[in-house]
């Protein structure tokens, strides 16, 4: 009688498709996956402990290095937590500038994520190059505003580092003229490719009940059919005054996660249009009076207490929990990283599929190991 034997194979920690040092222990029967266990920690850098021995503002550059694609969003989440803890208000103009930067970040992230996944799937470099083209234009805007293309360190407690330079909005408008055609072109490349459809439709399905049980958030959750978005569930900044839709999927497979990200780029475009229209009517302001004595005391000292702030980052719900003992350093600093939590159902999503599908399913989650391991 013919018998088969289960085999354990390792994918990673050094593997081009994991986009970082990440290991998967895969148990297979032939080519079919029976079990998959993700192994994290190879990029652990002690982020939270470093923040607990640093002043509050010294932690801001560290957040840039959590998810290096989304440094503006990371800055935003920490700024909200400290402002909540210290009772700091933010001028309306700074709020709109923050939203503008985060939505540009969302377009940058999703264009890169979809492009990288297509490239991993089989050398489809054309969509990747299209995504990189738009990403470069957005990075030019970031450099114009903050002086850095990636690790921007642009947000401050009570606002942003500086106002937008005069040439920023004209260059942003020029970028936005080409975005609708880019979205359509990007989507057409996906929908009309038979190979891509065969690799993504009904692959890596994450049922909504399983997604909720794992506390998944972001595009991965919405692709499973749950319309949860922190910008709507608990509006922060000026999102409560902006008009945008929350796209959701119906199946929760890799293909749905593709389409959700493309539609979210369109919604970010809508938000940017509204922000550009309202910015001329806003005024900036000086740093909040609550921070007036910081120069004398050398560092911000929030009153004793705790605060949790969360945002809808491009990868999901990003949260910062801070505990203050009244000193210039946080007593406790905790990060809720969406990449880490969204990665936990990977085994359930891969079970029953082929080994070749692991790369596709992992890429559709969109993780950055700096945020996973911290």
From Swiss-Prot:
Q: State the annotated membrane topology for this chain.
A: Peripheral membrane protein
What function is annotated for this protein?
NDH-1 shuttles electrons from NADH, via FMN and iron-sulfur (Fe-S) centers, to quinones in the respiratory chain. The immediate electron acceptor for the enzyme in this species is believed to be ubiquinone. Couples the redox reaction to proton translocation (for every two electrons transferred, four hydrogen ions are translocated across the cytoplasmic membrane), and thus conserves the redox energy in a proton gradient.
State the organism of origin. Roseiflexus castenholzii (strain DSM 13941 / HLO8)
Q: Catalytic activity annotated for this protein? A: a quinone + NADH + 5 H(+)(in) = a quinol + NAD(+) + 4 H(+)(out)
What quaternary arrangement does the UniProt entry report? Answer: NDH-1 is composed of 14 different subunits. Subunits NuoB, C, D, E, F, and G constitute the peripheral sector of the complex.
- State its Enzyme Commission number(s): 7.1.1.-
Signal sequence span is none
Protein name according to UniProt: NADH-quinone oxidoreductase subunit D 2
Q: Which domain of life is it from?
A: Bacteria
| InterPro entries from the UniProt entry | NADH_Q_OxRdtase_suD (IPR001135), NDH1_su_D/H (IPR022885), NiFe-Hase_large (IPR029014)
The entry assigns this protein to a family as follows: Belongs to the complex I 49 kDa subunit family.
Xref: Pfam families: Complex1_49kDa
PANTHER family referenced in this protein's UniProt entry, alphabetically? NADH DEHYDROGENASE [UBIQUINONE] IRON-SULFUR PROTEIN 2, MITOCHONDRIAL, NADH-UBIQUINONE OXIDOREDUCTASE 49 KDA SUBUNIT
Task: Give the Gene Ontology MF terms in alphabetical order.
Answer: NAD binding; NADH:ubiquinone reductase (non-electrogenic) activity; quinone binding
